[in-house]
Amino acid sequence: MSKQLLALNIDGALLRSNGKIHQATKDAIEYVKKKGIYVTLVTNRHFRSAQKIAKSLKLDAKLITHSGAYIAEKIDAPFFEKRISDDHTFNIVQVLESYQCNIRLLHEKYSIGNKKKVNSNLLGKALIHPSDPIFYPVQFVESLSDLLMDEPVSAPVIEVYTEHDIQHDITETITKAFPAVDVIRVNDEKLNIVPKGVSKEAGLALVASELGLSMDDVVAIGHQYDDLPMIELAGLGVAMGNAVPEIKRKADWVTRSNDEQGVAYMMKEYFRMQQRKGFLDKFHMKRV
């Protein structure tokens, strides 16, 4: 069965370890676009960051950003958005400030984080986002809750950078205290707190539906824990060679790693036999 929508994770899939996209990957994306495949990005990143990458790939698509909480082609005209209320954002931050963690409120137009002292590796991941565009303000403050008292924020996503051994405690505490949100494990050092029902897979299903497609028509490529549900739901779920073992076990296809152009390899191998939809319709042929 042919696929008509290709959903790509950014970090660990599109991007190599050096943070760059290989020319082979760009060429492969252009190749599948010429076959009539709708290509989009599915990411935890904020919209501005995903938009910058989409532009470099010449993608005109609804981008699934903020873990599925913000879907748009243009920042001021979202197709879908869902936020944590400013009251809940404030209260959740108060709870998180009792833990040894870095907090980042990821709005589509700016981000605000705290300066909590954690190990240098975690701090670097919370502070350094090399793809943040210059027009995306990033602010760090001593007390996030103090700032929110004066300047309320309704955040699509609250990022939490912390040690793996306290992730479960944070997840349990937030889930019990705030039923209006979900806590998603991204990797061993990061949790995302999102509005209830928000996820990458839910966002991808929305975009597919808007295109008149089902999840059976989708190829989804990812590598970390929060990619697993969309990989399982997609018609073809693909794990990167650098993916966590659980995703590799459950994927339909394991491609090469991000440093071995795994995305480009998979696209060329899978889509090379698939004809453009309009070509097949012209001759009343079934796609294979």
UniProtKB/Swiss-Prot annotation:
Q: Which GO terms describe its cellular component?
A: cytosol
This protein's UniProt keywords: Stress response
Q: Which residues form a coiled coil?
A: none
CDD domains given in the database record = HAD_Pase
Q: Does the keyword Plastid apply?
A: no
The UniProt GO MF terms for this protein read: magnesium ion binding; phosphatase activity
Induction, per UniProt: By phosphate starvation, via the PhoP/PhoR two-component regulatory system.
Q: What is this protein called?
A: Stress response protein YhaX
Organism this protein belongs to: Bacillus subtilis (strain 168)
The organism's taxonomic lineage, starting at the top? Bacteria, Bacillati, Bacillota, Bacilli, Bacillales
